[in-house]
Every structure is written in structure tokens, then in C-alpha cells.
Amino acid sequence: QEVDRDYSAAISNTIIPRAWIEAAVNAHFRIPWKDKNGELCIGFRPDQIPNIHGAGLDVADEGIDRNASALKQWIILRGVDEWGERDPGVTARRAMANFRQIKGIKVQYDCIGIGSNVKSEFNRLIESGDITIDEIMMIPWNAGDAVQEPFAHIVPDDEESLLNKDFFQNMKAQAWWSIRTRFFKTWKTLQSLDAYLKDGTPIEFYDPEELISLDGSIPLIKQLIKELAQPTGGPGASLRMVVNKKPKDTKSPNLADAVVMAYFPAIDDYGNVSVGSYGA
């Protein structure tokens, strides 16, 4: 299978090309895959989509920054939300109220700065009995943390590719690269599907678990596409990849940050380790 190995180009400009993002809109209706009998299937029916959910919460930090949340079902982004609120306690309650209907959901939340207060509000609600961890779990997500699986290659099973610890400065860079890889593979498999339907060219299949689809009915879809295509990457002082989320004259991509957290779970407080796809 072809893999995206243009590392230098990827980290010297926009991390995710807009064309890849646009291709992922409603991709779950067109993703090619094979059933257990090896038969070609195109797209997923509602009953074929796993009822597995996850969420991300980006907490407003300062100035005109806004809070944002993202909800995904399996590989499909089902919704995003954005609102202004300076009190992290109110923000935490809003997010928990929105997500608690999905029993057992894990919400990855930005725990840096003001976001650190989210866990305090969560613990207060647990202690008061207003919610339980069977309903919802809040998982701190620290963008500055060390990379996950540091000694794994950024392209699994490709020993020529760099190790995670040598390529990424921190978990933020790793997470953005991870979602970039999802968009790349989604775009690639859909391109190959079009070629197959046109002239029979073999399809480039990927495990659907490694892909991404953006529900086209999301009200803020245009803003989300713009935000996902905004961050740039480049080598930091240690020559490892760093992410610049706010190039000159741009606003913080809050929706995109929430989406990245939802698709790249951190090690949680409940004895579980959930790692995202780096390009597997």
C-alpha cells in the first residue's frame, strides 16, 4: 500500500491539504471495503456503523478565545459546537450535559491553563452524585505531553521511517500528524475507488478504522474545514515537528482542536490506554 512519506513537505507548510479534508465529507457513504466473503462493498449502512463514541473539549483560554467540542461515532465526526464562556465550570457542565446521554463516553479535554479546572468540576459532580463514571469519563489531554509509543515508527512496519520520539516534538504534533494520516488515507482510497469505477484500476484499500469521515450535515462544517486546513508545521529547535495552529492573521482553530483530541485519545485516569492511529 502507498503511504504518505513526504515528511519534509508536510512539516514545512499546511499540515492537512484542504482537498483531503473536503474529500472526507460524507466519506462513510463511499469508503470501499470488503466483507467477510471478500466482496466489494461501497459505503456503510447505519446498521454497519459501530455504536462507539468519543469526544473532545477545547477550553477557552484567554481574550476572545471560544470553547469548542466535537463528537464522533466510530470514524465519523457527528457534530461540533462552539460557544463563548469564561467560566470553566460552566463549560464543563455544558459539555457533560451534552455528552452524558451516551453512556460510558470518554471526553478528552484540554487540561492546560484554564482547562485544568474542568476536572475539579467533574469531581464535584461525581462526589455530589449528580453524575457517575458509568455515564461519562473526563480524560485530561495535555498537548505538551511526550509522544505516545515513542519507539514506534511513524509509518508502522516501515523501518526507514523515523521513530515517533525523533519526529514529533510533543503529543500535539503527533496528534495532528495522526489525523493528517487519516485524511490522506481517506482521500487516497476514494481516489482509487473513482479510478476503479472509471476503468477498473485496482482499489487501494485501507482498514476503515484508520480513516475519517465528516458528517456533511454538521452546521459548522465550512468553518471546521477551514480550521483543519489552517495549522502549519515545521522543525522546532530540536528539529522535531512542531505545530503552529495560528499562522499570521488567523484565529485559534478551536473546533479543529476538539476534533483532533477526539480522534487521538490520551492515556486516561481509569487504567486504560487508548492510542490513536499514527498511520497504521
Kindly label every feature range from the protein language model.
Residues Q48-Q73:
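Gly/Thr-rich phosphate-binding beta-strand-loop-beta motif of the actin/hexokinase/Hsp70
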Residues D58, D110, N254-D257:
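Acidic active-site catalytic centers that drive phospho-/nucleotidyl reactions
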Residues Q73-S238, V275-A280:
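Mg2+-dependent endonuclease catalytic cores in nucleic-acid-processing enzymes, primarily RNase H-like
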